[in-house]
Amino acid sequence: MSVAASVVNLGEIELQSGVVLPNLKISHATFGTLNASRSNAILMPTFYGGKHTDYEAIIGADKALDPSRYFIIAVDMMCNGLSSSPSNSDAPFSGADFPKITHWDNVQAQKKMLEQEYGIESLALVTGFSMGGQQANHWAAIFPDRVERMISWCGSAATAPHNWVFLEGVKAGLLADPTFSNGTYTTIPEAGIRAFARIWAGWGPSQAFYRHKLHQQLGQETAADHMQEFWEPNFLAFDANDLLGMMHTWQVANIADNDLYQGDFEAACNAITAKTILMPCETDLYFPVADNETQASLMSNVELRPIPSVWGHIAGAPGLNPVDSAFIDNAHRELLSS
């Protein structure tokens, strides 16, 4: 599979907060070839703790996301360590001084990158897992005339209060490490990140995932092994300020929280015209089906298709388990053929 990865410097960008960020960079990878009419573009924004390479597991000639048919752009959201982030920015915006990012900022930067680099003004599909699904929702609400189809799996249009509380708890585990030093650390706050990961381990999978010892399918014999061998390495691979930067974006996510909709969530949902499939997992502990039901009730041209899985939120993790990945692939295949 031919993959082209690059980092685009978009120059000076004013963020939703009013902060002007110089030399904003967007990292992405492309798969396939853009056709002459530029009508075969698919955008896949990344998720929390994810990078563009993670989507490679669900892209291929035998998949709905087929590079021989579509031009697929997997784009790194800000704060993930590849696009502009606390860890890779120069003073005065380095580390803890990096500005707060919203999904409005992510999608505006992605729009500029697509136009500047590829001349793309419309998308056949915007799709993503978790925070990638949140960005897909933002795209469809903010640019309804540019998005033909949208899939959000294990995601939401707005972060619910219970989800926000979960994230506050995880954050507290990291902040409690004195090494973190208000984000000015000179050595990795390893104890804090490990605590962060262990709290997360109780929320990413469902209760039934542990009850049925499904972590053994991932190579971890016990629940303790799963925490230490799956969750801890995943988060230790990230800079601590990057983790908190992405978390802020997640906590404040809301498609209506902008000048366009001025807090009117119903109006923002009503504005989405893209053919849409919302795919929460039946056992997701932080993006529950009920939240997606509320969103779907405010939209037209939408199907609510819960993932029938006991893997919880990680049912949507790209390529993590074959059954759920096939369910997600089938939804993409159906929507792209419509």
Residue ranges of model-derived segments:
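Alpha/beta-hydrolase-fold enzymes
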Residues: 146, 152-233
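Gly/Pro-rich cap/lid or specificity-loop segments adjacent to the active site
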Residues: 49-134, 138-141, 145-158, 162-167, ...
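Active-site nucleophile elbow and catalytic-triad environment of alpha/beta-hydrolase enzymes
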Residues: 229, 245-268
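Catalytic active-site module of serine/aspartate enzymes centered on a nucleophile-bearing elbow/loop
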Residues: 293-296, 301-338
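A short loop-to-beta-strand scaffold at the N-terminal edge of the catalytic core in hydrolase folds
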Residues: 21-33
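Short alpha-helix in the alpha/beta-hydrolase fold that links the catalytic acid
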Residues: 258-265, 274, 285-298
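Short beta-strand/loop motif that positions the catalytic acidic residue
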Residues: 272, 278-280
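Short beta-strand element of the alpha/beta-hydrolase
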Residues: 38-49
